[in-house]
Amino acid sequence: MARYTGASCRQCRREGMKLFLKGDRCYTDKCAIVKRNYAPGQHGQGRKKVSNYGLQLREKQKVKRIYGVLETQFRNLYERAENMPGKAGENLLSLLERRLDNVVYRMGLASSRKEARQLVTHGHFTLNGNKVDIPSLIVKVGDVIEVKEKSRSSAKFKNLVEVNSRIAPKWLEANVEGMTAKVVGVPTREDIDLEIAEHLIIELYSK
């Protein structure tokens, strides 16, 4: 499955909620959900009754869109979550939260997860002192993520530090001005401030 390259706002309208795909714009009245809170397309305003399978599928698509994950990656994370102690749904969300691109976003050094993914891919970060360019990498407790020394003086990062107002979750010890963060815990369900019914995803994959 190829990565979606269309308008981000259409995805939010399809899911009927803000997915925060466009950074700061999502917090303003310019957000498409504020203007047109119905699905895109000719028949978007007449939402049909959805079957249980449809609900499960929509929930999976929603979470994939929030985190910018493709189907193969998502399936692999689900299988990993199933083999971990505890509830599979909560494990899945915890793994998604610990993706490196999401950690950069949670640090406040990117306006969206999409931008965070691009910054990681372009090699602007180090992990435990080593250059890293894999957005899907899952960080662990004790890992230290930093903006690469050569990138710190760029206008891009200076501006991100100046405008940042995001509060890092408690599992992440972030120093935005220092452009660094340390993973001090594992994300729990209470740490994830997203409207997600993860049990529907588990039900879908369990069939």
UniProtKB/Swiss-Prot annotation:
S4 RNA-binding domain boundaries: 98-164
Q: Which InterPro entries match?
A: Ribosomal_uS4, Ribosomal_uS4_bac-type, Ribosomal_uS4_CS, Ribosomal_uS4_N, S4_RNA-bd, S4_RNA-bd_sf
Listed GO biological process terms: ribosomal small subunit biogenesis; translation
Q: Name one GO cellular component term.
A: small ribosomal subunit
Any GO MF annotation of the entry: rRNA binding
Ribosomal protein listed as a keyword? yes
What UniProt keywords are attached to this protein's entry? Ribonucleoprotein, Ribosomal protein, RNA-binding, rRNA-binding
The family classification in the record reads: Belongs to the universal ribosomal protein uS4 family.
Oligomeric state and interaction partners are given as:
Part of the 30S ribosomal subunit. Contacts protein S5. The interaction surface between S4 and S5 is involved in control of translational fidelity.
- Known role: One of the primary rRNA binding proteins, it binds directly to 16S rRNA where it nucleates assembly of the body of the 30S subunit. With S5 and S12 plays an important role in translational accuracy.
Kindly provide the name given to this protein in its UniProt entry: Small ribosomal subunit protein uS4
Organism name: Clostridioides difficile (strain 630) (Peptoclostridium difficile)
The upper taxonomy is: Bacteria, Bacillati, Bacillota, Clostridia, Peptostreptococcales
